[in-house]
Amino acid sequence: GVQTCALPILLDAAQIYDVVSDFVTLRKRGVNYVGLCPFHDDKTPSFYVSPAKGLCKCFACGKGGNAVHFIMEHEQMSYPEALKYLAKKYGIEIKERELSSEEKIAQGERESLFIVNNFARDYFQNILKNHVDGRSIGMAYFRSRGFRDDIIEKFQLGYCTESHDALAQEALKKGYKKDYLVKTGLCYETDDHRLRDRFWGRVIFPVHTLSGKVVAFGGRVLAGATKGVKVKYVNSPESEIYHKSNELYGIYFAKQAIVKQDRCFLVEGYTDVISMHQSGIENVVASSGTALTSGQIRMIHRFTNNMTVLYDGDAAGIKASIRGIDMLLEEGMNVKVCLLPDGDDPDSFARKHNATEFQAFIQENETDFIRFKTNLLLEDAGKDPIKRAELIGNLVQSISIIPEAIVRDVYIKECAQLLHVEDKLLVSEVAKRREKQAEQQAERAERERRS
């Protein structure tokens, strides 16, 4: 608990613009600032910040309040946690009162999981730097990827030795509870009730929340060391603090660059993100090999409207991920696609090129998603009329889910040219699809109202 005597000083110091702009891109409008609401699926900016009143409010979903309320809602913190966050941000000291036992338990559970994760992160980092295996196996792997020391430090990379329970033993010795080691997924229990490390024999990539807390880990197996291990990457299981669909690898390190460049690059893996950072491109996040969820897209959308998806030169992955891109369009993002040269992924390409060369390559080679999809499917369909009809249906579907009418119109004209069909045809098809979508939405809303 936090004593209230420091509150006026704290609220006075916590400038609402300053606090909110850590998480939302704000643009000046008159005496206020406005941005996309971080609390609901906001297509047009409805989140207002008033520096004069020290308040923020979304005029669509109604959420808002002062700086403390904003942090509580945004970072999922309790009132005392939010006060501590702001006190730390502004360097104000606050005295604490004793918490009630219920408060302690509820706050304790989440906080304990984060504390255990922090311990594990420090432990893995220490092993990487100071343990003989860490240096000869873990560090050797990162060196082979060309990672510099400052980058290894920045992303808090680590190593877990091949002894199956070294982390578990160290944690228990330091007084961390077995229960929390299992709940965070750092360890699991064998049938004979022994604790095993989930990440033994792997290099470690911590996953950070938007505000920089370690919420999970990814571990990559090293070829020579663990023959017979089938799974290349192991990730933390879902937990009370980790919901995979709400986290994006690299977002904490990328958010400022995304705002500055007003664009986000999407790649697939941890090493893609890290290599691009090292080559000087920081506005990049990874979907970690799964399709993007609307929660992840919304997180990016707070910072920018523009997304470029970077693909390896092989075609197999592209067809699979095209479905995910439709979701980006639906959330109102401008999506471009850039194919890297054959045989390169973002990681290998970034190692061969500096930031200027990489950016120049993207500028010259990125295409609008709809144009990209049209050309890709046209190649597939060839002259076959049935396949071409299917292709038109497919593109019409992508265009019909775009929220802004002007953007839809531009795409319709472009597609009509590429496909040698009349605008009118596509206009009426898109209109039909949109009517159908509106009906389905109304039905869904009605069902929810009844239930």
Question: What label would you give each PLM region?
Answer:
Residues 10-13, 27-30, 103-113, 131-136, ...:
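Conserved phosphate/pyrophosphate-binding and hydrolysis machinery centered on Walker-type P-loop NTPases
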